[in-house]
Amino acid sequence: MSATLALTEQLIARASVTPDDQHCQQIMTERLAALGFECETIASHGVTNLWAVKRGTDGRDGKLLAFAGHTDVVPTGPLEQWTSPPFVPAHRDGKLYGRGAADMKTSLAAFVVASEEFVAAHPDHRGAIAFLITSDEEGPATDGTVKVVELLQERGERLDYCIVGEPTSTAELGDVVKNGRRGSMSGELVIKGVQGHIAYPHLAKNPIHLLAPALAELAAEQWDAGNEYFPPTTWQVSNLHAGTGATNVIPGHADLLFNFRFSTASTVEGLQARVHAILDKHGLEYTLKWSVSGLPFLTPRGELSGALEHAIRTETGITTELSTTGGTSDGRFIARICPQVIEFGPPNGSIHKIDEHIEVRFVDPLKNVYRRALEQLIA
């Protein structure tokens, strides 16, 4: 069994459901400390975070490549639906099964073993290697990576490159990497009406009827055309509720929850202003609360994307696709302190599902791609 596969199994065996790290980071810390990493645990409200760094011969002047990821996993769902226990690594038909196999304990193991091999081959490496690991990525993400980033900002720490080990591949390892992500902004809209008897609508104001024309306009609006890297911004309703449950009462208010997934072609302020303008045009009486969970970020083609594309092509023969599709990730926080952030990891077809797994044939090539990136960027 390869070192990467063995470490992956060791991590899967830890039932590290958010925010419980279950000592996964301790396992990683022991391996990294043996390589000369300075390891720091940063705890916050039950969340465990790890910042580990090994400087090269250039000291603080050298380029720094960080590996970022999470030890936490999503809940298993009904245990009886799993073919084998989710926290007991199991091999079947060339696949390794277990919660976190794809998202993202294989990436964590590959990070560690790639670093071990790199340091052994390049003991006098010039640049620095760092690890930024959290147990709060699958949950609220309020005490994890964002807290470490804030601390690093206070210290004036500079990151030059960051590889986030999210499972970005689809059919084959390396066919897709993420060089950016869309922003996410949600709104809680309350339309005010006047409750009344449904037989006397002239004595009431139906907030559903009042909302309907504005809702149709919002749904049909083209917010932007996207750009070279991003698809057009989308606006979607996630929840709509009104009424008491009775069939003879006009509701007094209607509650609407919606979400924007937006590109760098739009801004928070611009999107908010356009929503308010549409609501105001229709003469609605309303309250609207906004929350922004992440801003869009983009890493244009450059040193990091080039290194990963070359490493993937050399290792797998695949020409990778740069993509910004999908949901948010911790990359949105890291982009605050790092100009080049790219996500790359194993295929994502089974993530968050019953019987999550990774094909064993991808495990060591993933490690090799990470090692090749180290060699190209900081050796």
Curated annotation (Swiss-Prot):
It catalyses: N-succinyl-(2S,6S)-2,6-diaminopimelate + H2O = (2S,6S)-2,6-diaminopimelate + succinate. CDD domains: M20_DapE_proteobac. Pathway: Amino-acid biosynthesis; L-lysine biosynthesis via DAP pathway; LL-2,6-diaminopimelate from (S)-tetrahydrodipicolinate (succinylase route): step 3/3. GO terms for biological process: diaminopimelate biosynthetic process; L-arginine biosynthetic process; lysine biosynthetic process via diaminopimelate. Its cofactor is Zn(2+); Co(2+). It holds the Pfam family Peptidase_M20. Zn(2+) 2 binds at D103, E138, H352. It is an enzyme of class 3 (hydrolase). The active site is at D72, E137 (proton acceptor). InterPro entries: ArgE/DapE_CS (IPR001261), Bact_exopeptidase_dim_dom (IPR036264), DapE_proteobac (IPR005941), Peptidase_M20 (IPR002933), Peptidase_M20_dimer (IPR011650), Peptidase_M20A (IPR050072). Its EC number is 3.5.1.18. Keywords: Amino-acid biosynthesis, Cobalt, Diaminopimelate biosynthesis, Hydrolase, Lysine biosynthesis, Metal-binding, Zinc. Gene3D superfamilies: Zn peptidases. SUPFAM superfamilies: Bacterial exopeptidase dimerisation domain (SSF55031), Zn-dependent exopeptidases (SSF53187). Zn(2+) 1 binds at H70, D103, E166. One of its GO terms (molecular function) is acetylornithine deacetylase activity. Catalyzes the hydrolysis of N-succinyl-L,L-diaminopimelic acid (SDAP), forming succinate and LL-2,6-diaminopimelate (DAP), an intermediate involved in the bacterial biosynthesis of lysine and meso-diaminopimelic acid, an essential component of bacterial cell walls. Homodimer. Belongs to the peptidase M20A family. DapE subfamily. This is Succinyl-diaminopimelate desuccinylase. It comes from Burkholderia cenocepacia (strain HI2424). The gene is dapE.
